Amino acid sequence: MMEKGSVVEAAVTRSPMQMKMGDHELEGNTTSALRTAETFLRLFPVGLCVSALVLMLKSSQQNEYGSVDYSDLGAFRYLVHANGICAGYSLFSAVIAAMPCPSTIPRAWTFFLLDQVLTYIILAAGAVSTEVLYLAENGDAATTWSSACGSFGRFCHKVTASVAITFVAVFCYVLLSLVSSYKLFTKYDAPASRPTEAIEVAAFPG
């Protein structure tokens, strides 16, 4: 009975050093889990961007009405380039994020800025491609543009799939932007609140 009590007492009375080591171990496990999650989140857009890029590169059709290719339209060429850039960046940033090195403020700022820039690049690519695809599907009576997808249905189907995958990649980049924003701004302390008693109000003569 005495021995059991001493064991319980030893377990309860942990030294400050032991408690500090336990806190550091818990923090290390949390950091490792977050690093793994961020790495996978950065790797996921690689497959999406490559899929959208390949689909767009294969978007061409030739029939009795003529021929059409993705390279005929600047919006689709931009989508290909944007997806290629984003795929390369996602792979590179995933490798950097997977490295077990301390996250410094310059590194956090770099990820934050690049994530923001790449998000807007691929969002713009999806937006302009959607507009062109809408015109190809429906035409424009005001400018006497007829619908092209009635004659080139296979081309439009591939382009639609490529644009849809691009918007899934946009969603992933929005999440990455939120993650990098959180990691950056948590490195700064919140502004200290000034007590109302310390605020001096200037007295003006009546």
From Swiss-Prot:
InterPro entries: CASP/CASPL, CASP_dom
Subcellular localization(s) per the UniProt record: Cell membrane
Signal sequence range: none
Annotated GO CC locations: plasma membrane
Record keyword Transmembrane helix present: yes
Topology versus the membrane: Multi-pass membrane protein
Keyword Membrane found: yes
Cytoplasmic side: 1-36, 100-107, 180-206
Quaternary structure note: Homodimer and heterodimers.
Name of the protein in its database record: CASP-like protein 2A2
